[in-house]
């Protein structure tokens, strides 16, 4: 992990303390970061999500190279969400039962959670972030499936769109524990929101993530995306709104309007949206298996 850094106690005012935390983050993000490495197997699996020529034999080979990924793929494959008719004891069985698309998504998800969404003392916050990320990824899959576009790529973009948030939490936790009481939960949330894009792009560069994933991180919040990867940006935007609604986060009038705009951007008609909403139970089951 990153070396501990103490802040001076000279400034006791809330605004001065927040300014020092902000300065600390800027300094950290301005230099080399001690980020969790992407294992060769995980990197290859992530790249396969953006490769239309990927095949199941190669996927099985990569999964077998990482015991953590392999064990968790089997765990999820045997969960109630995927309802296997008989116990799944091998990766070949898992791929045959679930298909390459599901195995790709499960593999990336379990690895990302283990490496990034684990900061001691911040389990509750990171659990909430993880639920949001997985729910967004699962909805992105359904949106892509309906439009017959790459579900693997949609899942990856949805899962990693806000990967900068746990990175910022890790950086903040790196400051000496004696100073952490000076940062309130509101201030922490403010700093996470302010720096998540920059941190996410740093992680994307370190992991050499596929270009469409980098685009969804860099351009999150773009109201009318165009150009390269605009389809993935629009899919993930709609997925994020549907995830927020499913997780019972409040959707005010503004968010309801954003939902309508997101549907229009993808040319999704009312009957298509109704069919999409009918997949809510499947999304919830997939979410339960991955969290």
Question: What is the predicted function of each stretch?
Answer:
Residues 1-178, 183-258, 286:
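Conserved alpha-helical "signature site"
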Residues 244-291:
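C-terminal appended segment following the main domain
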